[in-house]
Amino acid sequence: MARDTRADLFERIAQGSMWDLMLLSGGVSMGKYDLVEEVLREFGAEFFFTGALIQPGKPVVFGRLPKRGSFQHGEDGEYSVPHDGPWNGEWTYFFGLPGNPVSAQVCFALFVAPMLRALAGRSEIAPVFVEARLAEEVKGGARVTRFLPAELSGGWDGVEVRVVGWQGSGDVVANARGNGYVVLPAGVEHFPIGLTVRVLLR
């Protein structure tokens, strides 16, 4: 946990910069106290992308910064050892996820989980999608691709998906009722009953 101050964020990011991968949640939007990107730049961060054309989850960042130390094992457990001298060429990769829980979960499934699988040496690293028929019509018209909490159910005649009623990216109760996210592409005005759509599993 970090307070929304530059000093506290600096300390936490300094600690995280000794790991191979650092995850941050919150502070990556455009508000007065969203300081994560600014502080990361002070560490020499290189950003691969800042923001994604999805909803929820638009304010997400991914990049890397010079690794500032390492972890070693001793008799009393694991401890950190800051690097002295010039940078040794190693990187700490980072994700800055949105603070809202549904947004963070969508971004984790889309971006973070594949990165973790890659670091673990897995051959299949991509997000997992399945196809299902819409059990009810869904209104479209969004300018970004939407990932809406949804419930998959199946039988002998195939798999259906139904959007879970929710009140936004902070609605953890509604999100918990689903088992995936139905993918609604940008620019489509209407998604009729029976349409085959993709569903992101979580």
Name every feature range the model reports, one short phrase each:
Residues 1-35, 39-43:
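N-terminal small/polar loop signature for handling phosphorylated ligands or for N-terminal nucleophile
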